[in-house]
Structures are given as C-alpha cells and as structure tokens.
A protein has these predicted regions:
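A C-terminal cap/extension of S-adenosyl-L-methionine-dependent methyltransferases
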Residues: 3-5, 192, 211, 247-300
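N-terminal, positively charged/glycine-rich alpha-helical extensions of SAM-dependent methyltransferases
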Residues: 2-54
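Conserved alpha-helix/loop element of class I SAM-dependent methyltransferases that forms part
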Residues: 60-83, 100
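A short glycine-rich, Lys/Arg-flanked "PGG" loop and its adjoining helix->strand segment in the class I
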Residues: 175-187
Length: 300
C-alpha cells in the first residue's frame, strides 16, 4: 500500500530555494546514508560537471551529445512530435533523458516535474536547462526528495519517465513509489522506465552477488535490488498501474553480460569485449540481458 493512503503532499508543503523545492524534513533526509551517497556521486556524475566550467566557444555548448551522449533503449521507440501537458521524471539527474527527448524527438510539454534525491544533480539540471533550453515552453519544477510520496494530485500526470533509476531504490520504497505512480498518472497516460531494473538472472550480476556475500560489510550501497521480468510485472500489477495503463511491456535490454567488467573498481581484462560480442538467441535474451525496461503501450 502506498504511504499516500495516510499522507497527501503537494508542492505547497515544500520550500522553494534557488529553483529547487525541498521537503520540510530535508535536514533529516540529509543525514541518511542513501542521500549522502548520491550527493557525493552527483558532484561528478558521468563527467556531467564539465558543463559548469566550459567556455562559451566550447563545442559542448553547441552539441548536447558531447555532454551526455544519446540514451538508447526504449527512447529509440519513443514517438516524434508528441505533446503532453505534464511530464514527471523520477530520478531526473542532470536531465539527460528529457534533454534527448526534447531535442531529438521534439517532445513538448507545458509542465516538467523532475524529482531526484541528489541536490548537486538538480543544480546541474538547472545549468543544463539554461545552456540547451530543452522543453522551451514548459514550466520547470525540480524537487529534491526521496520520492516515497509524490506531491501531486490523483490523475494529474500525463507521462511518467525514468532512466536507469529503480535498481538504486530499496525494494519497499520502489513498491510504494509504483503505487504512487499509479495514483498520480492520468487514465490512459503513459510511462517509460528505460533500463530501470537490473536482471537477477544475468550471469554478470550473479558473479557480483557472490562476491558481495563474501564481503558483506563492503557491499555497494548504490545497486540495491535485481528482478526477473515476472517480478517486475507483479510489482506493476500490484501497484495498480493497469487501472490507468491497461497495456504495458517488460522487455530485456539489448545490453548483455556474462562477465562483470569491474570487480571492486578493478577492470576485468577482456570482459567488455566479450560482453559486447554477445548475440544471444531470442530464448536467451531474458537471461543474459543486463536489465529490463518497462513501458506502457502503445507508445503514441
């Protein structure tokens, strides 16, 4: 059951400071290990901090892909020239996914809500918005919180998106979050969770899991949970997603792995080349895929 059964929040319950909304218990949230980890990671996340220091003549300012690349996966299937009223992004980071959707897919919206637990990443999203002006006609609302309760009315969001996020969220919180998504998304709305779940059957993850059991005190606090396709479907069904989005797909990513490419930060020789060479048969894709995406259908 979602926490919203007992508590209902709105943005009026948050404090707006320098373009970011903060919950009333932000000082308490700042003391959690999970937030401290992501604030630290956010400072240098995938080199995105370079947007804050590059000169006016830098090619990065002319070509966003030099900063972020082009996210693939389900985003390749996203329709062109779609327009919606409201977009909610869970784990927005510095805005990589909406930047791509705005520039390459011409997705348009009137309101964009971005939620992330990392304040440094939200501050960087503001800078990315200034530099590239994605969703040029939209109101922007950035919210620094853990997203256990979404501060929106029932049936108020047209499109919920997320990119490579849910493997970082503890399982009970993820289940609550999916119930919240089912609450706030409009009937007939859309969701796209690209590469958002790690695959529990992937050989690479199985090796990592074995190593973590050997040294449990030094487990990576970032990657918290893995799922099978059927478990993901069960989470979505139990959350009530089908009452709003009757049809959806859970599909394996096209990134496959039989070997970890790093262990405890140490590169494994030839692992990347071996993983990139994999071309599994259809029957093996769900086993060898690094993760899963889930999205409502049709994407139109």
């Amino acid at each position: 059951m979602s926490p919203s059964a007992n508590v209902q929040l709105s943005l009026n319950d948050f404090e707006l400071r320098d373009g970011v909304y903060f919950p009333s218990d932000y000082a308490q949230l700042n003391q959690t290990k999970h937030k401290q980890t992501w604030d630290r990671i956010g400072k240098t996340y995938y080199g995105s901090q370079k947007i804050e220091t590059v000169g006016e003549a830098s090619p990065i300012k002319q070509d966003y892909t030099l900063l972020s690349g082009k996210p693939g996966g389900t985003w390749n299937k996203f329709p062109v020239d779609k327009s919606v009223d409201t977009i909610l992004e869970l784990g927005s980071g510095y805005g990589r996914a909406p930047l791509h959707l705005s520039k390459d897919k011409n997705l348009q919206c009137q309101k964009y809500y971005g939620i992330d637990i990392s304040e440094p990443l939200l501050r960087r999203l503001i800078k990315v918005k200034q530099e590239y002006n994605f969703f040029p006609d939209a109101e922007f609302h950035l919210i620094c919180t853990s997203a256990e309760i979404l501060p929106f009315p029932d049936n108020s969001i047209d499109l919920v998106i997320s990119n490579c996020v849910f493997m970082h969220i503890p399982d009970p919180q993820l289940r609550n979050l999916m119930a919240e998504v089912a609450r706030v998304i409009k009937p007939g709305g859309m969701f796209v969770f690209n590469h958002s779940f790690h695959n529990k059957d992937c050989p690479s993850h199985l090796v990592h899991n074995f190593i973590r059991k050997l040294n449990p005190v030094s487990r990576n606090p970032v990657y918290l949970k893995q799922y099978s396709a059927s478990e993901i479907g069960q989470i979505l069904d139990n959350a009530g997603i089908k009452t709003k989005c009757p049809q959806y797909v859970v599909e394996p990513t096209t990134e496959y792995a039989i070997l970890p490419e790093t262990i405890k930060g140490i590169p494994i020789p030839f692992a990347k080349a071996i993983n990139r060479s994999l071309k599994p048969a259809e029957s093996q894709k769900s086993k060898l895929a690094y993760g899963f995406s889930a999205y409502s259908t049709p994407l139109a």
